[in-house]
Amino acid sequence: NCYRPVADLVEMFLELSDELGMKFFFGTYDSWCHWHSDHPEKELELNLQVVEEAWLRYGHHKSFAGWYLSQEISRGRKSVATLYRELGRCCKEVSGGLPVLISPLIDGVKENRKQSVSLEDHQREWDEMFSLIRDGVDTVAFQDGHCEFHELSDYLAVNRQLAEKYGIECWSNCESFDRDMPIRFLPIKWEKMRFKLRAAEAAGVRKVITFEFSHFMS
């Protein structure tokens, strides 16, 4: 069963974005189950309906500036590359070419692992991923909280170099919560956030977004 919510939050945020001169990227649907099974067809089918309805309902807003593909991965997965490419193409076709953003993560030690993925493996896998998705994705903003602090600048530099190779814009997603604490999750200490911003700057990244302002920084 489906129930109509009391308030249309997407409409509310778009109206506020219109008023304040901000850019709004619409996040697509994430089923979690379909695309994790390495069969993205159902995920794509559901999202095509979401994208078409979203553009029909909200595309008239001047602040509607692009799309965010919500499926987040850390390693090279060709099935997800197919989803990114095909769904991104659909978003562009429906909206007259508005840009498409993804925000993958680095398969680091803080992703419940004993050690981070090697820089060489990360580079090799994402080189292939970018070659497969470049027709459907305009911008990549890697999450910056999963690896050790001293590793971050090297990963970000590789990300930027690979993105530029395939004509994809590279941002950084500076996480505003702390993965080093026993409680999941406390707002990050400013010194740590500044360190990550400096690492992005050193890697040649010129634009940064954050997850999540409304939760951890408000």
Which residues are covered by each model-predicted region?
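Glycan-processing catalytic domains of CAZymes
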Residues: 1-218
